[in-house]
């Protein structure tokens, strides 16, 4: 019960963290040191801040796309390896079944031969 409660609290905290990251505020206007700065400076600063923020996000998107490509490539490689291992396992299973059948036939032949020899020896003693 306590474990489930802790897990739900952790999940809630993770969701809350992701939500806050989604809606973090971009500082449009830097804090003005002088009260008399004009409207043009404020707009230019806002535009510069937005461009910087956009550049950071574009770089982050580019990095995440690279990571995604790498993970997709690794996943594809892993799937190929799993497929080849599965095929190899199937082939080995078939070979095992054939060898098991051959072994069973050899044992049966050997038992028949041993039975014939025993019958022959018994008939000589009678």
From Swiss-Prot:
CDD domains noted in UniProt: Atg16_CCD
Coiled coil residues, start to end: 76-113
Protein localization: Preautophagosomal structure membrane
Membrane topology: Peripheral membrane protein
Record Pfam families: ATG16 (PF08614)
Location (main, coarse): membrane
CC terms in the record's Gene Ontology section: phagophore assembly site membrane
Biological process per Gene Ontology, one example term: autophagy
Changes seen on gene knockout: Impairs the formation of preautophagosomal structures.
UniProtKB keywords: Autophagy, Coiled coil, Membrane, Protein transport, Transport
InterPro entries found in the cross-reference section: Autophagy-rel_prot_16_dom
Additional free-text comment from the UniProt record: Kluyveromyces marxianus proteins are shorter in length and have a more ordered secondary structure than their S.cerevisiae counterparts, which might contribute to the superior thermotolerance and solubility. K.marxianus could be therefore useful as a new model organism for further elucidation of the molecular details of autophagy.
Annotated function: Stabilizes the ATG5-ATG12 conjugate. The ATG5-ATG12/ATG16 complex is required for efficient promotion of ATG8-conjugation to phosphatidylethanolamine and ATG8 localization to the pre-autophagosomal structure (PAS). Also recruits ATG3 to the PAS. Involved in endoplasmic reticulum-specific autophagic process and is essential for the survival of cells subjected to severe ER stress.
Descriptive protein name: Autophagy-related protein 16
Source species: Kluyveromyces marxianus (strain DMKU3-1042 / BCC 29191 / NBRC 104275)
């Amino acid at each position: 019960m306590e474990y489930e409660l802790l897990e739900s609290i952790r999940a809630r905290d993770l969701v809350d963290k992701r939500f806050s990251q989604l809606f973090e505020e971009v500082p449009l206007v830097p804090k003005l040191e002088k009260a008399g700065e004009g409207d043009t400076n404020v707009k230019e600063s806002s535009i510069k801040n937005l461009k910087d923020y956009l550049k950071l996000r574009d770089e982050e998107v580019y990095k995440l796309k690279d990571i995604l490509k790498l993970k997709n490539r690794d996943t594809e490689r892993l799937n190929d390896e799993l497929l080849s291992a599965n095929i190899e396992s199937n082939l080995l299973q078939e070979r095992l079944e054939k060898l098991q059948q051959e072994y069973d036939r050899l044992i049966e032949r050997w038992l028949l031969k041993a039975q014939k020899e025993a019958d022959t020896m018994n008939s000589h003693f009678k």
